[in-house]
């Protein structure tokens, strides 16, 4: 970090998993500037502080979209070594590892495992290519081999290079970038994710009869790639984001450089997704599928590095002090919401700067209402699910998280007030079944009007259950009050007749 003249700070390097930065400024003229906010802040926080929970969260949602049997899931999780076609056994792995160790000891960027330091060196090439996207045949026409070797030696030395000095041509830089990716120990998308990418390419739409069509399901493919990219190592994910953005911007200039997204995919698929140990015969079966997959990544690169909304919401609840955050089985029940709905709190905070304390109370009420609505919708969804093993599992987990929550309201002994346990499921049940529980609560509470035998108590009887104990007590009191009223009226008539007879006698 280097200090600037106005007291601010700028980041000269490439930050890993760009975290949210907050700048405090007292200059009133700058307060109108937009505030930079990272919507995936809590997602990255969860990844770094609780990686086991993060991995389980992402994998559980990824398996909703693609079918990964036990062995393939274990490969994705890194529990077993990936078994790919054309694998030559332990001997080849040993020699590859030995070569990687030798390269690592020399501190070489090319051919070494991917690190943030290596990305910082390669970023000089990416930044230069962003300024020369109009070069015709970029990434297709090879450059000068001598200039490329000189540039490669400079990068391996760890020095800052003035690529724009005019000594190098854009084709030299583009070819060297492909060379760097090709010499990585494994593809940029890793061997562990190879099977998952093949499964994502097979996600197709279904017709009205439920039959699988040949039309790709783009929405599910984007969601699956978003989740899969979250599982990449941080250096791989950072470089992949830089690379796909460069290729996306290059494809936008295809009218000048003659390089479409498909042409770029043909150039880069061997370096970012093809397994290193595959032969031509092994690859022939999936060649078109892999190339089309890279084309899809380039076209939709601006969406692939954002966490799905339900992942953001889970991470936010995890760090917001929620007593019982949503479990992995509940995530598929959460509806997909727009980012504006999930970040209304940010805009509310921004609007209440300098406001009165009452606005703070209003903000808390809005936050509480937002959470309650989400929980209410979640419980309703579970309640309306057809009877199945999954529903029973969700209900068991739901009750396990809140063991003290009563399933139904029980009778309360006279003279003792029932203390309701304020638990997660209890709050949801009270919100979803609010009207029914409110009516039962009224039936169990004897109001002053009912104690006096008023008409109000009589009207309330039709709103409560016949079997409710409150009905019995209320009717008993009403009967007693009616008897007292009859006795009072009889006594009053007796007094009036006695008084009248006394007057007649006196006359």
UniProtKB/Swiss-Prot annotation:
Keywords: GTPase activation. The record marks 140 as: Arginine finger. GO terms for biological process: regulation of small GTPase mediated signal transduction; signal transduction. Residues 483-492 have a biased composition (Basic and acidic residues). Pfam families: RhoGAP. Signal peptide: none annotated. GO terms for cellular component: cytoplasm. Coiled coil: none annotated. It comes from the Eukaryota. The keyword Mitochondrion does not apply. Residues 400-413 have a biased composition (Polar residues). SUPFAM superfamilies: GTPase activation domain, GAP. One of its GO terms (molecular function) is GTPase activator activity. Residues 112-305 form the Rho-GAP domain. Residues 344-371, 400-419, 483-507 are annotated as: Disordered. Residues 355-369 have a biased composition (Low complexity). InterPro entries: ARHGAP19_RhoGAP, Rho_GTPase_activation_prot, RhoGAP_dom. PANTHER family: RHO GTPASE ACTIVATING PROTEIN 18,19-RELATED, RHO GTPASE-ACTIVATING PROTEIN 19. GTPase activator for the Rho-type GTPases by converting them to an inactive GDP-bound state. This is Rho GTPase-activating protein 19. It comes from Xenopus laevis (African clawed frog). The gene is arhgap19.
């Amino acid at each position: 970090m280097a200090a600037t003249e106005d007291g601010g700070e700028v980041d000269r390097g490439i930050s890993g998993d760009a975290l949210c930065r907050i700048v405090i400024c007292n200059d009133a003229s700058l307060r109108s500037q937009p505030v930079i906010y990272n919507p995936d802040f809590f997602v990255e926080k969860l990844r770094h502080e609780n990686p086991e929970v993060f991995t389980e969260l992402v994998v559980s949602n990824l398996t909703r979209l693609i079918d990964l049997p036990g062995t393939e899931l274990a490969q994705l999780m890194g529990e077993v070594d990936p078994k790919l076609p054309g694998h030559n056994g332990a001997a080849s792995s040993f020699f590859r590892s030995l070569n990687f160790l030798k390269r690592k000891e020399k501190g070489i960027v090319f051919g070494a495992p991917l690190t943030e330091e290596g990305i910082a060196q390669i970023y000089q090439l990416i930044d230069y290519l962003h300024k020369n996207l109009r070069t015709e045949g970029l990434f297709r026409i090879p450059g000068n081999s001598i200039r490329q070797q000189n540039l490669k030696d400079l990068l391996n030395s760890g020095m800052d290079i003035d690529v724009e000095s005019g000594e190098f041509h854009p084709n030299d830089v583009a070819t060297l970038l492909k060379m760097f990716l090709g010499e990585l120990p494994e593809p940029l998308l890793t061997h562990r994710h190879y099977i998952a990418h093949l499964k994502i390419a097979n996600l197709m739409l279904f017709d009205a009869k439920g039959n699988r069509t040949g039309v790709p399901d783009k929405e599910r493919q984007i969601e699956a790639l978003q989740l899969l990219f979250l599982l990449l190592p941080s250096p791989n994910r950072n470089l992949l984001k830089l690379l796909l953005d460069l290729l996306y911007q290059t494809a936008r200039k295809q009218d000048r450089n003659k390089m479409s997204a498909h042409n770029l995919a043909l150039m880069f698929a061997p370096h970012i997704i093809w397994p290193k140990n595959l032969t031509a015969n092994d690859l022939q079966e999936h060649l078109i599928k892999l190339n089309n997959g890279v084309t899809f990544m380039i076209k939709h690169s601006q969406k692939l590095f954002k966490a799905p909304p339900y992942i953001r919401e889970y991470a936010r609840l995890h760090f917001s002090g929620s007593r019982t955050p949503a479990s992995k089985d509940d995530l598929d029940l959460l509806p997909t919401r727009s980012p504006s709905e999930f970040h209304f709190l940010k805009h509310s905070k921004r609007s209440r700067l300098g406001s009165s304390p009452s606005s703070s109370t209003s903000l808390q009420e809005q936050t509480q209402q937002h959470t309650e609505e989400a929980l209410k919708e979640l419980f309703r969804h579970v309640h309306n699910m057809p009877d199945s093993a999954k529903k029973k599992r969700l209900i068991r987990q739901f009750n396990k998280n809140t063991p003290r929550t009563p399933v139904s309201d029980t009778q309360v002994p006279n003279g003792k007030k029932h203390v309701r346990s304020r638990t997660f499921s209890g709050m949801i049940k009270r919100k979803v079944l609010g009207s029914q529980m409110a009516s039962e609560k009224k039936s169990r509470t004897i109001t002053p009007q009912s104690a006096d035998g008023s008409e109000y108590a009589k009207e309330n009887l039709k709103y409560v259950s016949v079997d409710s104990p409150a009905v019995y007590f209320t009717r008993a009191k009403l009967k007693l009050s009616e008897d007292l009223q009859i006795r009072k009226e009889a006594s009053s008539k007796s007094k009036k007749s006695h008084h009248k007879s006394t007057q007649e006698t006196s006359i």
